[in-house]
């Protein structure tokens, strides 16, 4: 008997130790979960993730989270083969579409020809145009932007173009139109950017600016068929919660839910769990990354993990025998590490169903995130194209 509903929850940026190729990214020593645990000195309480095996899959347990003996599910880690360490790379690879050619990055800012086109289209001047922390850039330039109506253009170590503007100065819909236009400028072949991100903010002055939930990602369209496309073609339902819709440009998705926050995202998961469908629900919870990882805030990161863990308890309670849950991440963003960028890490893989035959077994280190998608496809009798399925290990047959 295969599983009727498969739920995947991506804890955005919750890595579990430096990947084998971390040196290429200058990320040796990164360990998001490990360093958050160290910061909490034993006070990080994750009972539900713990009983699923979040410490079992690590070489050393997370401080405060004992190894489960036995774990109620199966556990392992996944390595990324994509060229980058952005959300897009990670999610696409999970769905059988690893990004093997590095996308364009802009350590010195965007070329003048792109800036000129943005200024001409928007009728607004562009300022900053260099790598910057998103919270620091509005602190340093937000008041000026309010006075002048300019566009704050910045990037990071990833293949992203970010445009920030105060919502009272440039309405959100106008900012989206500018970002949609920017998307057309960097779809290749000369420049290929993974994501254009609209970054609206509010507040009276630099000490009180906050970025709003009206953030919107304009992703590169998937450059090939994904496992979600394959599931839909086979007649299964595909539901996206959070920025899944943005990451895949709406492709391969029947219904999408926009999240205001992690807790709002878990409300959506609870809502979807009440629905009768046959297929796949793919959820991204971005607060770990956006609110705490980039800001190098281990305290907030740990609290977000504990808040998620509480909500996870309800998901486990509500699961039907023919439901399958997989929890993972798309990359790391170690709040105890240097810089403000993502970190190249292995990601956790936690798998649970009330009816699984062999809980408490290690799934090992998977050699690509695509193993996750391949497993979902095999469950639904669809031929996997990329990755090695671990369906037989986790099945209820």
UniProtKB/Swiss-Prot annotation:
Mn(2+) 1 binds at residues 12, 330-331. Keywords: Cytoplasm, Isomerase, Manganese, Metal-binding. Pathway: Carbohydrate degradation; 2-deoxy-D-ribose 1-phosphate degradation; D-glyceraldehyde 3-phosphate and acetaldehyde from 2-deoxy-alpha-D-ribose 1-phosphate: step 1/2. Mn(2+) 2 binds at residues 289, 294, 342. Its EC number is 5.4.2.7. One of its GO terms (cellular component) is cytosol. Its cofactor is Mn(2+). It catalyses: 2-deoxy-alpha-D-ribose 1-phosphate = 2-deoxy-D-ribose 5-phosphate; alpha-D-ribose 1-phosphate = D-ribose 5-phosphate. InterPro entries: Alkaline_phosphatase_core_sf, DeoB, Metalloenzyme, Phosphopentomutase_DeoB_cap_sf. GO terms for biological process: 2-deoxyribose 1-phosphate catabolic process; 5-phosphoribose 1-diphosphate biosynthetic process; metabolic compound salvage; nucleotide metabolic process. GO terms for molecular function: magnesium ion binding; manganese ion binding; phosphopentomutase activity. Binds 2 manganese ions. It comes from the Bacteria. The keyword Cytoplasm applies. Pfam families: Metalloenzyme (PF01676). It is found in: Cytoplasm. PANTHER family: PHOSPHOPENTOMUTASE. Isomerase that catalyzes the conversion of deoxy-ribose 1-phosphate (dRib-1-P) and ribose 1-phosphate (Rib-1-P) to deoxy-ribose 5-phosphate (dRib-5-P) and ribose 5-phosphate (Rib-5-P), respectively. Belongs to the phosphopentomutase family. This is Phosphopentomutase. It comes from Limosilactobacillus reuteri (strain DSM 20016).
């Amino acid at each position: 008997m295969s599983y009727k509903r498969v739920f995947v929850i991506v804890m955005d940026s919750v890595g579990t130790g430096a990947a084998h190729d971390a040196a290429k990214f200058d990320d040796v020593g990164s360990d998001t979960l490990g360093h958050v645990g160290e910061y909490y000195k034993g006070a990080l309480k994750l009972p539900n993730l713990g009983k699923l095996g979040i410490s079992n899959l690590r070489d050393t347990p997370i401080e405060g989270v004992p190894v489960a003996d036995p774990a109620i599910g199966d556990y392992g880690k996944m390595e990324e083969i994509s060229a980058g360490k952005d959300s897009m790379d990670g999610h696409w690879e999970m769905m059988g579409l690893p990004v093997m050619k590095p996308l364009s990055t802009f350590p010195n800012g965007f070329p003048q020809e792109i800036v000129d086109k943005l200024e001409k289209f928007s009728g607004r001047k562009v300022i900053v145009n260099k790598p910057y922390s998103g919270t620091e850039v509005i602190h340093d330039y937000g008041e000026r932007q309010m006075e002048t109506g300019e566009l704050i253009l910045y990037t990071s170590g990833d293949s992203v173009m970010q445009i920030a503007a105060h919502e009272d100065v440039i309405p959100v819909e106008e900012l989206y139109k500018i970002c949609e236009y920017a998307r057309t400028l960097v779809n290749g072949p000369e420049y290929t950017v993974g994501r254009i991100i609209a970054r609206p903010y509010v507040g009276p002055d630099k000490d009180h600016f906050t970025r709003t939930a009206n953030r919107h990602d304009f992703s590169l369209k998937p450059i090939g068929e994904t496992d979600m496309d394959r599931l839909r073609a086979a007649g299964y339902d595909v539901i996206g919660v959070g920025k899944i819709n943005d990451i895949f440009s709406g492709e391969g998705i029947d219904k999408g839910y926009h999240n205001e926050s992690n807790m709002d995202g878990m409300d959506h998961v609870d809502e979807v769990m009440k629905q009768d469908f046959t297929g796949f629900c793919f959820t991204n919870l971005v607060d770990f990354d956006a609110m705490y990882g980039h800001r190098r805030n281990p305290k907030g990161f740990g609290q977000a993990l504990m808040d998620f863990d509480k909500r996870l308890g309800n998901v486990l309670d509500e699961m039907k025998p023919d439901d399958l849950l997989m929890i993972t991440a798309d990359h790391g963003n170690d709040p105890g590490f240097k810089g403000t960028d993502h970190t190249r890490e292995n990601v956790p893989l936690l798998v649970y169903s009330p009816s699984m035959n062999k809980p408490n077994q290690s799934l090992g280190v998977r050699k690509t995130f695509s193993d996750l998608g391949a497993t979902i496809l095999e469950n639904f009798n669809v031929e996997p194209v990329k990755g090695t399925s671990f369906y037989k290990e986790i099945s209820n047959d």
